[in-house]
Amino acid sequence: MRDARTARADDYGLARLKVSASPLYLREAEVRRGVDLLQLGQSHLLRAIDPLLREAAIGRAHYRMLGHVTRWPGLAMGDLIDLSGTSKQALTRVARELEERGLILIAPGLLDRRRRELRPSEAGTALVAQLEARLAAVMAEAYAGAGQDAVTGFWQVLEGLVPVASRIRMAEWERGR
Protein backbone atom coordinates (compact mmCIF):
# COMPACT_ATOMS: atom_id res chain seq x y z
CA MET A 1 0.00 0.00 0.00
CA ARG A 2 1.27 3.46 -0.85
CA ASP A 3 1.47 6.29 1.60
CA ALA A 4 -0.02 9.72 0.89
CA ARG A 5 3.24 10.98 -0.63
CA THR A 6 3.41 8.29 -3.33
CA ALA A 7 -0.28 7.62 -3.91
CA ARG A 8 -1.84 8.28 -7.27
CA ALA A 9 -5.21 9.98 -7.59
CA ASP A 10 -6.74 6.74 -8.91
CA ASP A 11 -5.76 4.96 -5.68
CA TYR A 12 -8.38 7.05 -3.93
CA GLY A 13 -10.91 7.23 -6.76
CA LEU A 14 -10.21 10.95 -7.10
CA ALA A 15 -9.02 11.13 -10.69
CA ARG A 16 -12.42 12.08 -12.04
CA LEU A 17 -13.77 13.79 -8.95
CA LYS A 18 -15.52 17.01 -9.91
CA VAL A 19 -15.94 19.59 -7.21
CA SER A 20 -18.45 22.36 -7.21
CA ALA A 21 -18.31 25.58 -5.25
CA SER A 22 -20.97 25.96 -2.64
CA PRO A 23 -23.69 28.51 -3.36
CA LEU A 24 -22.30 30.12 -0.20
CA TYR A 25 -18.85 30.50 -1.78
CA LEU A 26 -18.14 33.82 -0.02
CA ARG A 27 -18.30 32.31 3.46
CA GLU A 28 -15.06 32.17 5.41
CA ALA A 29 -14.71 28.38 5.21
CA GLU A 30 -15.18 28.38 1.43
CA VAL A 31 -12.74 31.26 0.92
CA ARG A 32 -10.20 29.54 3.18
CA ARG A 33 -10.60 26.33 1.18
CA GLY A 34 -9.80 28.27 -1.99
CA VAL A 35 -6.70 29.82 -0.42
CA ASP A 36 -5.55 26.42 0.83
CA LEU A 37 -6.07 24.80 -2.57
CA LEU A 38 -4.29 27.67 -4.34
CA GLN A 39 -1.25 27.38 -2.05
CA LEU A 40 -1.18 23.59 -2.22
CA GLY A 41 -1.62 23.61 -6.00
CA GLN A 42 1.18 26.14 -6.45
CA SER A 43 3.47 24.10 -4.23
CA HIS A 44 2.87 20.92 -6.22
CA LEU A 45 3.08 22.72 -9.56
CA LEU A 46 6.48 24.18 -8.72
CA ARG A 47 7.79 20.82 -7.49
CA ALA A 48 7.67 19.71 -11.12
CA ILE A 49 10.53 22.10 -11.94
CA ASP A 50 12.57 21.72 -8.76
CA PRO A 51 14.94 19.13 -10.31
CA LEU A 52 15.74 21.50 -13.21
CA LEU A 53 16.21 24.39 -10.79
CA ARG A 54 18.64 22.33 -8.70
CA GLU A 55 20.53 21.35 -11.85
CA ALA A 56 20.82 25.04 -12.82
CA ALA A 57 21.79 25.93 -9.22
CA ILE A 58 18.98 28.46 -8.89
CA GLY A 59 15.87 28.72 -6.76
CA ARG A 60 12.23 29.51 -7.36
CA ALA A 61 12.77 33.25 -6.88
CA HIS A 62 15.39 33.11 -9.62
CA TYR A 63 12.93 31.31 -11.90
CA ARG A 64 10.23 33.92 -11.26
CA MET A 65 12.57 36.77 -12.18
CA LEU A 66 14.01 34.93 -15.17
CA GLY A 67 10.50 34.14 -16.39
CA HIS A 68 9.45 37.80 -16.19
CA VAL A 69 12.64 38.96 -17.90
CA THR A 70 12.18 36.38 -20.67
CA ARG A 71 8.53 37.31 -21.15
CA TRP A 72 9.21 41.06 -21.13
CA PRO A 73 12.84 41.72 -22.15
CA GLY A 74 14.05 45.18 -21.17
CA LEU A 75 12.19 45.34 -17.88
CA ALA A 76 13.87 47.55 -15.33
CA MET A 77 14.45 46.60 -11.71
CA GLY A 78 11.74 49.10 -10.73
CA ASP A 79 9.27 47.31 -13.01
CA LEU A 80 10.06 44.00 -11.33
CA ILE A 81 9.68 45.53 -7.88
CA ASP A 82 6.25 46.88 -8.86
CA LEU A 83 5.22 43.58 -10.44
CA SER A 84 6.38 41.25 -7.68
CA GLY A 85 6.12 43.39 -4.58
CA THR A 86 9.56 42.09 -3.62
CA SER A 87 12.10 44.39 -2.00
CA LYS A 88 14.81 46.05 -4.09
CA GLN A 89 17.45 44.36 -1.95
CA ALA A 90 16.06 40.87 -2.58
CA LEU A 91 15.59 41.46 -6.32
CA THR A 92 19.07 42.94 -6.67
CA ARG A 93 20.59 39.83 -5.07
CA VAL A 94 18.61 37.49 -7.35
CA ALA A 95 19.46 39.57 -10.45
CA ARG A 96 23.15 39.58 -9.57
CA GLU A 97 23.14 35.78 -9.12
CA LEU A 98 21.34 35.25 -12.44
CA GLU A 99 23.85 37.54 -14.16
CA GLU A 100 26.78 35.65 -12.58
CA ARG A 101 25.34 32.37 -13.90
CA GLY A 102 25.04 33.86 -17.38
CA LEU A 103 21.24 33.68 -17.45
CA ILE A 104 20.45 37.41 -17.74
CA LEU A 105 22.17 40.52 -19.01
CA ILE A 106 21.91 43.81 -17.11
CA ALA A 107 22.65 46.97 -19.07
CA PRO A 108 21.84 50.68 -19.01
CA GLY A 109 18.58 51.54 -20.77
CA LEU A 110 18.58 52.59 -24.40
CA LEU A 111 16.53 55.74 -23.73
CA ASP A 112 17.43 56.39 -20.10
CA ARG A 113 20.98 55.39 -19.17
CA ARG A 114 20.09 55.49 -15.45
CA ARG A 115 17.57 52.70 -15.98
CA ARG A 116 19.03 49.21 -15.53
CA GLU A 117 17.32 46.95 -18.04
CA LEU A 118 17.29 43.18 -17.76
CA ARG A 119 17.29 40.84 -20.73
CA PRO A 120 17.60 37.07 -20.89
CA SER A 121 20.74 35.50 -22.29
CA GLU A 122 20.46 32.60 -24.74
CA ALA A 123 21.09 30.22 -21.84
CA GLY A 124 18.39 31.95 -19.78
CA THR A 125 15.87 31.70 -22.60
CA ALA A 126 16.69 28.01 -23.10
CA LEU A 127 16.31 27.28 -19.38
CA VAL A 128 12.95 29.08 -19.19
CA ALA A 129 11.75 27.05 -22.19
CA GLN A 130 12.61 23.81 -20.36
CA LEU A 131 11.01 24.95 -17.11
CA GLU A 132 7.85 26.19 -18.79
CA ALA A 133 7.49 22.97 -20.81
CA ARG A 134 7.39 21.01 -17.55
CA LEU A 135 4.94 23.44 -15.97
CA ALA A 136 2.77 23.38 -19.09
CA ALA A 137 2.55 19.59 -18.97
CA VAL A 138 1.33 19.67 -15.36
CA MET A 139 -1.14 22.48 -16.07
CA ALA A 140 -2.44 20.76 -19.23
CA GLU A 141 -3.19 17.63 -17.23
CA ALA A 142 -5.10 19.63 -14.62
CA TYR A 143 -6.91 21.63 -17.33
CA ALA A 144 -7.95 18.45 -19.13
CA GLY A 145 -9.46 17.09 -15.93
CA ALA A 146 -11.31 20.32 -15.16
CA GLY A 147 -12.69 21.32 -18.56
CA GLN A 148 -12.93 24.61 -20.44
CA ASP A 149 -15.52 26.30 -18.22
CA ALA A 150 -13.51 25.55 -15.08
CA VAL A 151 -10.30 26.83 -16.69
CA THR A 152 -12.07 30.05 -17.69
CA GLY A 153 -13.32 30.49 -14.12
CA PHE A 154 -9.86 29.74 -12.76
CA TRP A 155 -8.33 32.42 -14.99
CA GLN A 156 -10.98 34.90 -13.89
CA VAL A 157 -10.21 34.24 -10.22
CA LEU A 158 -6.46 34.57 -10.79
CA GLU A 159 -6.92 37.82 -12.71
CA GLY A 160 -9.03 39.07 -9.82
CA LEU A 161 -6.05 38.51 -7.51
CA VAL A 162 -3.77 40.70 -9.64
CA PRO A 163 -4.28 44.42 -8.99
CA VAL A 164 -5.70 46.34 -11.96
CA ALA A 165 -2.60 48.56 -12.13
CA SER A 166 -0.38 45.48 -12.52
CA ARG A 167 -2.63 44.03 -15.23
CA ILE A 168 -2.45 47.34 -17.11
CA ARG A 169 1.37 47.39 -16.85
CA MET A 170 1.57 43.80 -18.07
CA ALA A 171 -0.64 44.66 -21.07
CA GLU A 172 1.59 47.65 -21.84
CA TRP A 173 4.70 45.45 -21.70
CA GLU A 174 3.01 42.95 -24.02
CA ARG A 175 2.25 45.70 -26.56
CA GLY A 176 5.78 47.08 -26.20
CA ARG A 177 7.40 43.85 -27.24
Language-model-detected regions and their locations in the chain:
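Residues at secondary-structure transition points
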Residues: 25, 29-32, 36, 40, ...
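N-terminal leader segment of winged-helix/HTH proteins
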Residues: 1-56
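N-terminal helix-turn-helix DNA-binding core of bacterial DNA-binding proteins
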Residues: 36, 43, 47-90, 101, ...
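Hydrophobic alpha-helical core bundles mediating ligand binding, dimerization, or RNAP-core interactions
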Residues: 31-53, 128-147, 151-165, 169
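Charged, amphipathic alpha-helical coiled-coil/dimerization segments
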Residues: 12-13, 96-159
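Membrane-interacting alpha-helical segments
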Residues: 20, 31, 118, 175-177
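Short, charged, intrinsically disordered terminal tails
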Residues: 26-27, 163-177
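DNA-binding alpha-helical recognition surfaces that contact promoter or target DNA
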Residues: 93
